[in-house]
Swiss-Prot record:
Family: Belongs to the 14-3-3 family.
Lineage of origin: Eukaryota, Viridiplantae, Streptophyta, Embryophyta, Tracheophyta
InterPro entries xref list: 14-3-3 (IPR000308), 14-3-3_CS (IPR023409), 14-3-3_dom_sf (IPR036815), 14-3-3_domain (IPR023410)
Alphabetical list of Gene3D superfamilies matching this protein: 14-3-3 domain (1.20.190.20)
Source organism: Lilium longiflorum
SMART domains: 14_3_3
Name of this chain's protein: 14-3-3-like protein
A matching Pfam family: 14-3-3
Disulphide linkage map: none
């Protein structure tokens, strides 16, 4: 007799355990099991956040690796070290294959389970934003037609999320603010549209400021943190010393990504 499949509760507990141990690949596996077992039912807010945090950490490590390797590649190219450049390109390809696999995994899960089963506006925006995020991560390293396709898919997902967020969520809602933050980063980094990026970030910030007094205690910390990130990016993007600043553009960190 084969052992019984772990229950939904057991998988959630194991995901929390994996998070504590910083074993994020396994955390992803546990939360994917939860997402697949619920089928047509929605994930709870806690489950949704655990899934987001798991994937954010798994993808975050590779994105950081890719940036470091790409930076070294540029330096070696400028020095004319062709042998090193060839080795680096191969290694970068390995990281890109991992990035593609991770993004494909969560995007399939979003399309097959998470987006179709979401009914509440908050969860719809959350998952569509997530869909946009992972298409954006693909656009960061893809080139040519693949990059164009990833960018178009990002725009589509973010716009769908934005339509619902503007109609259904308060300007101070952390998910609406997180969407504005990441959407503006997409305009700036992927579409090279600083004006659009600044307009979107400024509008989101101004609208939230005007309704700050309506902010509930439970989301005050998350909302004000994202507002600070929006303001940081605006300062960076509008400054004349853009190139020299060297600051990393702020996007929703894993702390707020999972809200």
């Amino acid at each position: 007799m084969s052992p019984a499949e772990p229950s939904r509760e057991e998988n959630v507990y194991m995901a929390k355990l994996a998070e504590q141990a910083e074993r994020y690949e396994e955390m992803v596996e546990f939360m994917e099991k939860v997402a697949r077992t619920v089928d047509t039912e929605e994930l709870t807010v806690e489950e949704r956040n655990l899934l987001s945090v798991a994937y954010k950490n798994v993808i975050g490590a590779r994105r950081a690796s890719w940036r470091i390797i790409s930076s070294i590649e540029q330096k070696e190219e400028s020095r004319g070290n062709e042998d090193h450049v060839a080795l680096i390109k191969d290694y970068r390809g390995k990281i890109e294959a991992e990035l593609s696999k991770i993004c494909d995994g969560i995007l399939k899960l979003l399309d097959s389970h998470l987006v179709p089963s979401s009914t509440a506006p908050e969860s719809k925006v959350f998952y569509l934003k997530m869909k946009g995020d992972y298409h954006r991560y693909l656009a960061e390293f893809k080139s040519g037609a693949e990059r164009k396709e990833a960018a178009e898919s990002t725009l589509l997902a973010y716009k769908s999320a934005q339509d619902i967020a503007l109609a259904e969520l308060a300007p101070t809602h952390p998910i609406r603010l997180g969407l504005a933050l990441n959407f503006s980063v997409f305009y700036y980094e992927i579409l090279n549209s600083p004006d659009r990026a600044c307009n979107l970030a400024k509008q989101a910030f101004d609208e939230a400021i005007s309704e700050l007094d309506t902010l509930g205690e439970e989301s005050y910390k998350d909302s004000t943190l994202i507002m600070q990130l929006l303001r940081d990016n605006l300062t960076l993007w509008t400054s004349d010393i853009n190139e020299e600043a060297g600051d990393e553009i702020k996007e929703a960190s894993k702390a707020v990504e999972g809200q």
